[in-house]
Amino acid sequence: MLLRYFNPIGAHESGLIGEDPKGIPNNLLPYVAQVAVGKLACVGVFGDDYPTPDGTGVRDYIHVVDLARGHVAALDWMGGKVGTGAANTLGTIAGEPADDGTRRGVGIFNLGTGTGSSVLDVVHAFERACGKELPYEVKPRRAGDIAENYAACDKARDELGWIAEYDLDRMCADSWRWQSQN
């Protein structure tokens, strides 16, 4: 089973479980959260000249709870029976069930929302969550960054019966709850 994650963010809605990276965060949302609580001065926005609606990079962000649900759906898809024998047909290599119901081979699924949010979308959603304006500074593009990247989730929907449920505002609200309580 291979699950490809697309930018996990968020925290448990209780505010008890979340992400607290050591040092300066490498990922956008923990960085934005630390700006919101005053640990960091300003969000760096790397490029505002991409061919996207607001000029900033677009990524597919997925709530960590949706990601956990995706794992459960993947386990259910395997039926609790994962074969250990060698696959002998293309179908079993591709993860189709064998006659005995076991699955041999590899199932590959994208876990994301299937839609993209820009860097500024994330900043503004977090502003709504925390109730204040967050300072940001536009900086030059980083080498190798692409304009957009988001998941094609139709296979996960069709075969696992799974779709992401949380939107960006909920992801940011849960992250803010965690960050402000810890």
Where are these regions (language model features)?
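Conserved beta-loop-beta element that borders a ligand/cofactor-binding pocket
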Residues: 1-14, 42-46
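C-terminal substrate-binding subdomain of Rossmann-fold SDR/epimerase-dehydratase oxidoreductases
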Residues: 28-182
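Hydrophobic, Gly/Ser/Ala-rich alpha-helical and linker tracts in large acyl-processing enzymes
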Residues: 13-25, 32-35
